[in-house]
Amino acid sequence: MPDQYTKAYDLMIKTNHYLIKGGELTPPQNAKITRLLQENRITDGRKKTFNAYWYPRFYIPPHNNGKKLQTIVPISPGTSIVADNAYEFEILRLLHLFQPKGEVTHMIEETLNRLKHTCFGYKSCHYAECFEAGMMVLRFLSFAAPQDKDWLQKQITVYNNHFADRRRHSGVQKYYWLILSDMPQEIALPEIQRQKEIILDHINRSYIIKNKSEDILLYVMRNTLARLPEYAHIKNRQPYIDEKSGRLRFNSHSP
């Protein structure tokens, strides 16, 4: 039977996917999700004290027999630094959406302060796991500190300068598109324009239906492209099953 921390992880993933697909939650649903997530704050006994600034203080993912849990856009993290931070950031993001005050504000402020003491969160480190961890920080900053344009831009520069340094998991680039779908508009639009042709190439492909991860990726690509004025018309479009091939597709063309 899943423990309480596993249930919190599942709730975080399902809620994020629902919102990415354009779903809307009622106030009672928001309140219930908030309560369940707040009940799963870690105890002092589960906190990691080695290099404490690198690891979450409020939420860490379940043990899962030592296997790192995937991020909401499927990446299988290779280290706890990436997995643990991604998990905490996503929960804090949901809490911020549903109850942006009081203890939630305190946790976000504490986390921002923690990140300023990390190489991957504040010092533009791009080596090993720090590149992916820095991406998780960028998504966190987009809601936690949208006014800090310099910090946001610094993390973007790390991505642009070092993404091509080596071969990366296919989900890394798509995670960046997820980040762009929620980033402050004035910073996001030039980056989306830079990524536009690559996103179009991917969104116009067909995908195997049984692969659920491809479904959420199509919505991420839709949401990102739709921020550009010339693609605003696709904002509410849904993926569909091609009658001939039986594969999942998305129509990004004009009406």
Regions found by a protein language model. Give the residues of each.
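Preference for long, amphipathic alpha-helical scaffolds in soluble/luminal domains
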Residues: 1-255
